[in-house]
Amino acid sequence: MDFREILMIASKGQGVNNVPKRYSLAVGPPKKDPKVKGVQSAAVQAFLKRKEEELRRKALEEKRRKEELVKKRIELKHDKKARAMAKRTKDNFHGYNGIPIEEKSKKRQATESHTSQGTDREYEMEEENEFLEYNHAESEQEYEEEQEPPKVESKPKVPLKSAPPPMNFTDLLRLAEKKQFEPVEIKVVKKSEERPMTAEELREREFLERKHRRKKLETDGKLPPTVSKKAPSQKESVGTKLSKGSGDRHPSSKGMPLPHAEKKSRPSMANEKHLALSSSKSMPGERIKAGSGNSSQPSLREGHDKPVFNGAGKPHSSTSSPSVPKTSASRTQKSAVEHKAKKSLSHPSHSRPGPMVTPHNKAKSPGVRQPGSSSSSAPGQPSTGVARPTVSSGPVPRRQNGSSSSGPERSISGSKKPTNDSNPSRRTVSGTCGPGQPASSSGGPGRPISGSVSSARPLGSSRGPGRPVSSPHELRRPVSGLGPPGRSVSGPGRSISGSIPAGRTVSNSVPGRPVSSLGPGQTVSSSGPTIKPKCTVVSETISSKNIISRSSNGQMNGMKPPLSGYRAAQGPQRLPFPTGYKRQREYEEEDDDDDEYDSEMEDFIEDEGEPQEEISKHIREIFGYDRKKYKDESDYALRYMESSWKEQQKEEAKSLRLGMQEDLEEMRREEEEMQRRRAKKLKRR
């Protein structure tokens, strides 16, 4: 084929290709689906029936499955209950010691199990029914709840007020002119700060609270105290009982009315130190005047268990030690008592030689309350009437001249710091004598005193068990040769043991600490701020365990005391304070220093009326734990002492952040160090 022919063929093909193929763009007629008119064919009907049946079957299956699940659930629930009950009873049998398990005969057991099975089945059925009903009710409720919202929506909607038309510019200007000089009120939204309060803020808040409380108390205090009316009758009964014939023994007036009275007076008198003065003045009619010289009168016969107040507000007990029948000692005592009385009040003491009760225990300086039962306030609360420590139940043998010595007696003296007193810290002395000791409230000079040498064992354990002397200040001893000023009373807080010639210490309690005696002849001044007249077994056992029975000069119980001059030289032996009480001690020393009412000390003894007191007292004695340690912490601080989970997480995050920062800094430092070293190495090269 030659070249020309090829070109010819190519040119022919070119012409054919030039005409493009085109599809018609005209829209054709619409295609209509042929619709079957009238009844559907049999095949279609059969198909539809089959579908419906399937749906119905599925629904039934679903229902059955649900019921089965519910049944299983109930069974499980029941099993769980039964298992838990079984476990509980099994476990608890350790606690039921002494309850015998009844052995049942096999027949009986079989019948019981049969009945129990029946009851179980019934129970299951009931529970199932209940559950189904409950489910039904629940689903109905849910359904109703679902249906209700649309009803709420279907209420005719109140058409929203259309926005006011926008103002003209001229109107706006006019309004601006008007409002230009009016002050704009900006509402300050207070942000409640979450940060904890600072110590100063806390102090301020506490101070305000205290003020408020004081005002309340003052308003309450204006109401006359009702309880103290019980006192005179009690005292009289004690007096008359003690003055009966010398042979009879009797239980001296049982302190039973005390607790009830205490309960009554507590609410009204809690924290009422500042009412001490007014209350003591308010009942002048109840003070029984003692006969001037008749120390054998019944009123003075009770004297052995009354603290003697020598007007300066310091009671000392009329308890005498049996082992010293010497007149010289009793004379020094008498002269000391007289000297004290002359100093403080114009009441002359008509006491005869021999340790006896001076009339001052009735006529005291105003504001000094006699501690004890008449006001029947909890020890540590101001007593209102004239009061004496009651002799708590126990047979009291009679002694010569009608003065009985109370063996297992407790004299509770509620001594709280009177505020405007001539002497801020009254020390109370428990007037108890050992079983063999007469408290000779009257006795001629040098009258021999019968009885064993089992003297009252002093245990001034007001600070901690085993400390011989409880008063935080030194106990000054009288020197028998020195005559009237044999008692060196230096300052308000000194205890006066001069009234006791024999050298048995009478435990002097710290202000606000009552003195109680437990057991025959054991004087235990209590360690807590409150003591109830009833003494529990626990306290007795504790006191007998922990306490070293020796008088304050360190001598043991049976030994004769050395001469008082020697005693003065030797000085009292004292154990160190347990650390738990340091804070309290500081408070008490502050108390001694200032005579005026101290607002800070207003709530010194706070938790008086609580039934916890006995328990906490024993806990304190055993463990040295003091609940009052956190007393001056505010409620706020105590509440937030334990942090919440959120706060803990915050702290964690904070510490983590700080830790990471520290790590980064350390790494940076290390890098810098490395660079420095490298630079040094390069320089050396």
Curated annotation (Swiss-Prot):
The keyword Lipid biosynthesis does not apply. Changing M641A: Strongly reduces affinity for histones. Residues 79-168, 188-615, 644-685 are annotated as: Disordered. Residues 571-685 are annotated as: Important for interaction with histones. GO terms for biological process: heterochromatin formation; nucleosome assembly; regulation of DNA-templated transcription; transcription by RNA polymerase I. It is found in: Nucleus, Nucleolus. The modification Phosphoserine is found at S278, S471, S599. Keywords: Acetylation, Coiled coil, DNA-binding, Isopeptide bond, Nucleus, Phosphoprotein, Transcription, Transcription regulation, Ubl conjugation. Residues 45-81, 123-148, 645-685 form a coiled coil. Residues 1-570 are annotated as: Important for interaction with DNA. Residues 101-111, 188-209, 260-275, 644-655, 666-676 have a biased composition (Basic and acidic residues). Residues 317-330, 365-385, 402-415, 435-501, 542-553 have a biased composition (Low complexity). There is a cross-link at K37, K187 (Glycyl lysine isopeptide (Lys-Gly) (interchain with G-Cter in SUMO2)). GO terms for cellular component: nucleolus; nucleoplasm. Residues 416-431, 519-529 have a biased composition (Polar residues). Interacts with histones. Interacts with a heterotetrameric complex formed by histone H3 and H4, especially when the histone tetramer is not bound to DNA. Interacts with histone H3.3. PANTHER family: PROTEIN SPT2 HOMOLOG (PTHR22691:SF8), YEAST SPT2-RELATED (PTHR22691). Belongs to the SPT2 family. The histone binding domain can functionally complement the yeast ortholog in regulating histone exchange and suppression of spurious transcription. This is Protein SPT2 homolog.
